């Protein structure tokens, strides 16, 4: 025995009961009684008609099983060693007090500045040494000699 379901109310339709409505696009609707057929034809929303199965389902009426809450995974940051720094070194640097960290940063900046100054002085000295060894600069044009103008000849 095949039991159909009412397209509007969701009620069971036993064999020999109910009516069939075929829409223009060949979609079939089954109704258990004229009440649900009438409401369907009035274009009523079954979720808003209090006695329908859809209404009860939509408004969580009747018996419902407790659905276990969906657990979401929480991301936890894991500290790993990177190239050039071991895990111990990273942890040690992180645990430094801000004052100590600032002092270290200032010392490093000062040392870098001094190194840069020394490099610049060394480069300047090297340049001066090269200039002294080369002597006075002579341009290529001067080395070749000035352009000689050819004297015009006439007949």
UniProtKB/Swiss-Prot annotation:
**SUPFAM superfamilies per the record?**
Glucocorticoid receptor-like (DNA-binding domain)
Compositional bias (Basic and acidic residues) at which positions?
98-129
- Biological process (GO) annotations? cytoplasmic translation
Alphabetized InterPro entries for the sequence = L24e/L24_sf, Ribosomal_eL24, Ribosomal_eL24-rel_N, Ribosomal_eL24_CS
CC per GO annotation: cytosolic large ribosomal subunit
> Where does the record place the region Disordered?
98-155
Keyword Ribosomal protein tagged: yes
Q: Which GO terms describe its molecular function?
A: mRNA binding; structural constituent of ribosome
Known CDD domains for this protein? Ribosomal_L24e_L24
Does the UniProt entry include the keyword Isomerase? no
Could you list this entry's UniProt keywords, alphabetically sorted.
Answer: Ribonucleoprotein, Ribosomal protein
Name of a matching Pfam family: Ribosomal_L24e
Query: Which cysteines link up through disulfide bonds?
Result: none
Family the UniProt entry places it in: Belongs to the eukaryotic ribosomal protein eL24 family.
Q: What is this protein called?
A: Large ribosomal subunit protein eL24
Organism of origin is Candida glabrata (strain ATCC 2001 / BCRC 20586 / JCM 3761 / NBRC 0622 / NRRL Y-65 / CBS 138)
Lineage of this protein's species? Eukaryota, Fungi, Dikarya, Ascomycota, Saccharomycotina
């Amino acid at each position: 025995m095949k039991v159909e379901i009412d397209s509007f109310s969701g009620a069971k339709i036993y064999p020999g009961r109910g009516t069939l409505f075929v829409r223009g696009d060949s979609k079939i609707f089954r109704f258990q009684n004229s009440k649900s057929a009438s409401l369907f034809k009035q274009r009523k929303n079954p979720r808003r008609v209090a006695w329908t199965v859809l209404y009860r389902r939509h408004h969580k009426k009747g018996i419902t099983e407790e659905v276990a809450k969906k657990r979401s995974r929480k991301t936890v940051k894991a500290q790993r060693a990177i190239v050039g720094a071991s895990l111990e070194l990273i942890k040690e640097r992180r645990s430094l007090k801000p004052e100590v960290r600032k002092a270290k940063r200032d010392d490093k900046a000062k040392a870098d500045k001094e190194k840069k100054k020394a490099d610049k002085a060394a480069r300047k000295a090297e340049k001066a040494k090269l200039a002294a060894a080369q002597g006075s600069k002579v341009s290529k044009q001067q080395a070749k000699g000035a352009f000689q103008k050819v004297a015009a000849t006439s007949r």
